[in-house]
């Protein structure tokens, strides 16, 4: 299972951003994840990225601007790719039983969240502050998880033994 940080770096490779901009964004994500947004200074970002502090601000103006650039890339590319990888792997019709299907999904997502807890924390905490991020995240979840899982759930409903409900 690839990390969000790795996926983020991969999406930046195919972007129109300069090498220095990519270095600033990758370093910022790493630092925001490790020590928090509030504790990360522009000087730390510059040092970690191997650029001058002036370079950081010439590209992104503020730390908020850096975070916005990271989150927009997350919402446009990283999260949809991560969910698509998960959906392709977990939502295949023909699962053994509903309980095994459900258990595998929950276990997979718990491992994913554990492995990416700081990046998930950044995204979720920002979605509490910014309603547009929250709405976009909701749309991504509906289109990338709810819609693909519906046919699988319908298959389980067809096989469900209704007498188990009546007991």
Predicted regions and their residues:
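Amphipathic alpha-helical packing segments from all-alpha helical-bundle domains
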Residues: 100, 110-124, 131-158
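Hydrophobic alpha-helical connector segments
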Residues: 69, 84-115
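Short, basic, alpha-helical segments at the C-terminal edge of helix-turn-helix-like DNA-binding modules
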Residues: 42, 72-78, 83
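Helix-turn-helix
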Residues: 12, 23, 31-65, 69-70
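Hydrophobic/aromatic-rich alpha-helical bundle segments in the mid-to-C-terminal region
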Residues: 12, 135, 157-167
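Short helix-capping/turn signature of helix-turn-helix
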Residues: 37, 60, 124-130
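N-terminal intrinsically disordered/low-complexity leader segments
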Residues: 1-19, 86-89
């Amino acid at each position: 299972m690839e990390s969000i940080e790795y996926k983020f770096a991969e999406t930046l490779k195919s972007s129109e951003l300069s090498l220095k901009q990519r270095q600033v964004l990758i370093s910022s994500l790493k630092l925001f994840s490790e020590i928090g947004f509030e504790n990360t200074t522009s000087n730390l970002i510059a040092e970690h990225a191997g650029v001058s502090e002036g370079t950081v601000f010439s590209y992104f103006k503020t730390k908020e601007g850096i975070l916005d650039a990271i989150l927009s890339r997350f919402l446009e590319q990283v999260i949809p790719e991560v969910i698509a990888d998960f959906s392709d792997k977990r939502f295949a019709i023909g699962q053994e039983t509903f309980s095994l299907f459900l258990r595998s999904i929950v276990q997979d997502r718990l491992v994913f969240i554990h492995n990416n807890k700081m990046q998930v924390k950044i995204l979720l905490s920002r979605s509490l502050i910014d309603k547009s991020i929250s709405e976009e995240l909701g749309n991504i979840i509906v289109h990338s998880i709810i819609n693909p899982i519906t046919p699988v759930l319908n298959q389980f409903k067809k096989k469900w033994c209704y007498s188990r409900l009546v007991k």
